[in-house]
Amino acid sequence: MKKIFAAVLLAASAVLAQEQPNDQAYTDAIRRYTTDPNFMTELVDHLPASATVPTPLKFHGYIAGQEGRLTYAEDVYRYMRALDDASPRVKVFTLGKSEEGREMILVAIANEETIANLDRYREITRRLSDPRKLSEEDARQLIADGKPIYYATGAMHSPETGSPEMLMELAYRLAVEETPFIRSIRDNIVTLLTPVIEVDGRNRQVDLWRYREKNPGVPTPPLVYWGHHVAHDNNRDNIGLALNLSNNVMKAYFDFHPQVVHDLHESIPFLYISTGTGPYNPALDPLMIDEWHRMAYNEVNELTRRGLPGVWTHGFYDGWAPNYMFWIGMGHNSIGRFYETFGNRWPTTEERVVRGTSERQWFRPNPPLPKVRWSLRNNVNFQQSGLLLALNDMAKNRARFLENFWTLSKRSIAKPSNEGPAAYVFPADQKRSGNLRDLITVLQKHGVEVHATQQALTIDPAWPPAKPAEKAADAKATDAKAKDPKPKSPNVTFAKGSYVVRMDQPYSRLADALLDVQFVRGEDRVYDDTGWTLAYLKNVDFTRVANADVLEVPMNLLAAPPAAPASPASSDIEHARKYFADPSTKKPRIAILHTWLRTQDEGWYRLALESLGVPYDYISTQDVAAMPNVREKYDVVIFPPVGASSISGDIVNGMAPGPALPWKTTELTPNLGGIDETDDMRPGLGLSGVQHLTRFVKDGGLLITVRDTAEWAIDYGLVRWVQSVPLAKLKAPGTIVRGKLTVTKSPVTAGYDETVPLFFSNSPILKVGVREEQRAQGRPSGRGGANDPDVPQGRPFVPLPEREKPKPGEEGFQPPEDAAYNFEPYMPRPEDRPKVLVTFHDKADQLLMSGMLEGGDELAGKPAVILAPRGRGHVLLFAVNPMWRMNTQGMYPLVMNAVINWDKLR
């Protein structure tokens, strides 16, 4: 079939370019399902006919964006493979599987010659990616011979349903249409498509549409599970690379080294083309940022010229964190970008009111309409028109994209001699070498090179080092030397075998973004986390070395991560791995508890335990409500944060009353269930569940609560003498702060140093005790200054006694200064009091390690980890999130030590 098609094309391409007929039925349907002529362009208002290649209409029986139609991932793949079978311009590859075993694919589209020689073209981009192995002359020849590659991905976020439909039509159009516009794309570039990123969630979303069609007039269950572990956060995995979808897309990147990676999303109206408001990540090359803007404004201009309303850029997203999927491109010297197209979730036509974004702004002079009748086909038209213009821009600037790719790679390896630093060095003699092994593993998955030194290394990390003459000229320095017979040397010594991440490698900017310390001003508007310094999150030692002499030290490139430590410290993640892998150890019976409100944050906990080889049962709040004796089945219950804006009452009461919202596997919904099932998502924990968990703790169990579930435990009385403090001015959006151990002999904190990096995100702020904090009183108005005592006249002065400082463990439980006997009935016994194991640093100016922090005085000294006894058991409360997005391995042992020692916490 392909040979016949190729022969026809060679014989008649000129005629087709002039006279190619349209598929009239398909073209009529495009116009029927588009709600306004201004929501179409000449690029997508038709579809050419083909005698040999099937359209989506011929294959599926409906067009892309048709009312009432959504396509399962497997059916999208069947169509793409039908194109592969029918056209020599299309080739389909398998990328890998999801956690539930569903396939992810990659579709390559170009002209016949390019597809036939695809390996040659991807070898060109691979060679251009590493300037260390290529002469300037050879690079120029490769740029002249090569073709840039544009990689677009769809359906990462499962409720965003339009992109798989659109990408099927786009693939057909690129393979079949013979207009000069499309032929230029096909002849000059390679287009790569992954039509469905989150395949598990896509199929669940289509199931819910089928349910909605069969059950009109009643609410449709919310999409509580997207992927097997997480939902929207699948676009926050580009640091940890813990999800299959992230690793599959990374594989596609390294297979082809595309010059653009473009994620297709759906939210705000009508089409937002990413640039961002800033702050931009400081590791990014200015050339890359300039290219973002050039491409975005080109598409905004071209679509606005064609009469489309509501196409804009700038005023959404920031450009700061490297955790988004399109950073797979940006971290590897390619352009990363995304669209946000207006969507209805369902394949229905809806009357929508647009507020806020329909207002004209300097960055949005052509705003969306304030009221609109919006269809799925409108969504397809906007996405496809924009993407076609982007592809055409690459085709017209073929050499520019390859040249920029090469130039960005060259500038990356020049980093040590330009802006620096030269390297990041991780000492070999780490206390938590298992955590370091995890960090190195992540870097290598990103393609970042890590070396091991062949000998010990002593170096001044600063650059340039001070000259002896300059030191002698400094009188103060000379005086200091005279007073200190052993002045401190600026040099740092690293043992043989220490690990070096060199900055003279192609992906130095990604390594720098992940390893350096972040600072964000409090007035900046941020979109997500602000601090992610990997060495802090994994609690390992490192040194940022600006001195380029470090690059002259003999070292070997690591082919694989180092071996796991044989005897890991208790604060090393390998400790839990070895404990649960050892058949001789006593294993606790563990349950992870989830609500039916939201499962994303707890999904990261499931993934964390699985990564450590820890077995667990997965139960819902409804299960606990029906389980009077939880202790009979479990020793430890982990209740991860619910997330979003959930409050304690929501956990107990569940969703609003109404018709049942089933989440289960049926003939109609074969992809629901599996992870967990219920006949009705509405009921919550209920007061019976609160009682059952209270009994579980009293009977000797350990309940671990985090953030909002810690507040729930406080609000519903599972924990006594702990309060949540309202916020006034604190701003810490995804920030790494410094914590201090207050109890060093607890099994929970075993192996930790006196200070520990903690990941904290705005709330909660907790305090312990039975009385309000006694604040220092100011003096009354009188003589003297603010610090002078007030002296009554006519008698000798009697000073006010100094307040007695509370003894360790009595903070918040100190009796009143006067008539303490009146308070005795209300004072809990020492053995019943909650113990603060870890606090936030007590000095506000010492709190911030990485990210944004304002109003830190509200956080300073407050509890971060509390162990509250109750009966024979305990509730462990975290104000921080110790298992966040598979990045915070340095905090995992605070959870796992408690789990392992659940019956030894007294």
Where in this protein do the model-derived segments appear?
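Short, solvent-exposed turn/loop segments enriched in Gly/Ser/Thr/Pro and often Arg
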Residues: 196-199, 209, 264-271, 709
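Mobile, glycine- and charge-enriched loop segments
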Residues: 191-243
